[in-house]
């Protein structure tokens, strides 16, 4: 059969339908809310070499469409019909990306020949380790993040290896839930195998094998066509997390985007060193690792929404991921909260592409997503644990409309869990679950609003985890005149006299009656807010999205008895335009915290910092980074005049004298 574009689309529809069927099986049979409601899972049809050639379009997380299974496929020596293999070890092939993610794959045989694989991952609520849910930035090494399984067969020729499940059950906090989810994952693979065999029966073995390659080739052509519309050039962007460790320093990711015709290089050189916390990404330095390409996939889809979602999209691009950096950590670094860093790579990539084509891309999404979980007891003293779902914010304002409120691509399209289900899963009382007024960045097109979740706990010993807490300080940037979104807030007992601001804490030990409130950040706005139609501002006020006060101060819209006063609005907007300021890094508006930070830590100084750190052994880098941050802060505190990047080298020379062991370490690095 000749695979022209029409046949490719028909074949793609069959394969995507098979992947969708796998996803539906998992959603309908999983036990934990984080899978059946939030949908933190993936599934795919995979070539014999390990490349995904079909993925669902409507179900599951969207971060894994280019995940390369090759490194783990090769670690199983002999595949037989009925086998299923699994791993959750981030350092065994870099396919599982933190310990709660169990990746499984199943060979599909037809008439004795291995045709392809079906595979996917699920996020388990808990895999043991030092803290409930297995994830916290307080953890510093992988051994603290729960039990790990290197690539191993869990099913051999149709027979389940119960001993592996027994080992897992002895190490996790909710063993029945874990077992139920794994059995659902196995059912998903059985269904995937069935659907693939049906396609083979329809198309034949030869055409099916040809079709796999045709789908990858077609996606590659689509990606090249999109990249070719971006002007050639080198585009630098940086993005920050609030803290690189518990109460730590800001963490920076850097991206040097190089566009050359139909190809692109994503060079992460200049990103922070491997951290003594769990924010590290275990990419193995692969030139096309899915975690480093999430933003790239989203940019492609933003620019052309009919692209095929498979690994062919990645052929025109390669990544540079320096070893021993936060984007390519080496064992035994903790990696549990790699999703915080991955979310930053998403907005980082949009920022770099926006240097080239700001008029075609949205403002920054609300990147401060937190996943809320509760471990508590019921009235009978039984331990219960559940994920309450993601709490973050919306999408950035777009060139043609407002960003979606409360959710979006920045959270991998994870879905919310209904309040009623959360209250049924664990004994808590939801006080509020709503959008946050005035949180979206002002713009011609408003940034998406943040979410607020507030609930009360009742049992002693209750622990609340809020993994990936961020955006308490650094805001989500606006673009082309749009302003930054509001930052996040995390509070215990917010209405009480003893209210406690929790900052970026991700583990809270609660007493009976405590109330926890998390307010997610908002997304950035697109375009000048003074150009927003006054009727749209009025609509936002009536809907509760924008307060009357902020309608006036942000948009220059004056309301009088629930109506727009056009005369006063025009006069106020003229005055505000006369007073508008030029942005220091047009077309971006970063917000006051980042503006102040980059006044001290300029691009030149940060380049000096990362050059120094790259010359050191991995074990020294995080420590020296903090020492240099403290040294520069001390200079400013003393009121000394500090100019240029030379001060960073001067501070490092002082550290070399303070720590004599550092000199030979640097020479041998």
Task: Provide a role label for each language-model segment.
Residues 1-81, 86-110, 114-668:
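Glycine/proline-enriched, intrinsically flexible loops and inter-domain linkers
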